[in-house]
Every structure is written in structure tokens, then in C-alpha cells.
Amino acid sequence: MIVAPAEANNQAARTSAQTRRRVAVLGGNRIPFARSDGAYAEASNQDMFTAALDGLVDRFGLAGERLGVVVGGAVLKHSRDFNLTRESVLGSELSSYTPAFDIQQACGTGLQAAIAAADGIASGRYEVAAAGGVDTTSDPPIGFGDDLRRTLLRLRRAASHVERLKLVGKLPATLGVEIPANKEPRTGMSMGEHAAVTAKQMGI
């Protein structure tokens, strides 16, 4: 941690404000909203984000163009989606040289992506950038329960056939899946329930 006098911090803030460039939103694109398990039941986050990007490309004539960056993300991601935004860029008509990275902050993911892109433009790192978010409840990342996952990992590490057979014998007792729940892990309440509590406490 670096600590500086308040005067120095204020001076740095003034200097930063003077050198930061103005940022403008030039346009946008999205795919239509649809009910869960409806039109997009077989579509992945990557499918939908790529489609939204290609719509942006078509709308603004960006085919083959290299942008400064594409920032995006999703809340419910499969393990295969660890590089979701980059893979979506590679699947789009944008130049494959366009950098991209993921960001995640609950339902504010798309907004935080836009802020990150705008900050990059304001500081001079990029001339132009794209940002967005995507999520589907039709294709949630259903995972193994901890017991099954740990047993499978032990099976992979087993050094002998005898050890493997013992572990295989334990599998039926450890079967289980985990489906993402619409609730905060610490409170067990959904975002809507939290909003209701907040409104009640603040008299809204």
C-alpha cells in the first residue's frame, strides 16, 4: 500500500481529470429477450453474445475491424466459458486481433463492462471499444456435488486398479448434482427479496 498526503492525492486527481478524454456512446445492439426455455433453449451464452456482437458489426460496418477491446461477461457460466468474451469475438466478424476480457458483477455485469471500456477510452488506452453482458437460465451450469467431484478426483489420482475399484464402489452413494439457485449464498434470499427488505427498511 502507498500512502500520500491528501494534497498530493487532490493534485493527482485534478491532473487526472484534466488529462482524461471525454467518452461517447455511439450505439448498441442486442438480441430480443425471450422467456426461459423458449426461443433460446438450445443457445449458449457464447452463441448469444456472438450474435449480439455480429449485429453490432452489421449495424456499424465493423466487419474485419480491430477494436481497442471488447469487455463482456455473464453471471451463470459453464467451466468452458472461462474465456467467454474472447471466444465470442473469435466467433464474430470482428478482427481476431481484437483483445477481449471477461468481467462479472451479478446483474450489473454489463454495466461494469461498459464502465471498464469507457475508463480505457478516457485514459487513452483505446480509441474505441465495445461492451456488453449475456445470461441464460435455459442453459445453467449444472455441476456435480462436492462428494462426487472429490471421488472422481481421487479416482483420477489413484495409483492402482485396486484403489480405483474401491473408489468406483463408492460412486453410487456420492451421486448428486448442483443447480444454480437464484439466491445470495449468505442470506438465502433472492435479489427481489433483498429489494423488498430494503424498501421496507427505508420506507419506500
Task: Locate the predicted segments by residue.
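Short glycine-rich or small-residue beta-strand-to-loop segments that form or flank ligand, phosphate
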Residues: V70-A74
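Glycine-/small-residue-rich active-site loops that bind phosphorylated ligands and cofactors
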Residues: L76-K77, T109
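Short glycine/threonine-rich loop-to-helix capping motif typified by GTGT followed
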Residues: H78-L84
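Residue-level detector of conserved, well-ordered beta-strand and adjacent loop positions
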Residues: L26-G27, Q104
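Acyl-thioester C-C bond-transforming condensing/cleaving domain
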Residues: I2-R21, R35-A43, F49-G64, F82, ...
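Short polar catalytic/cofactor-binding loops
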Residues: G28-F33
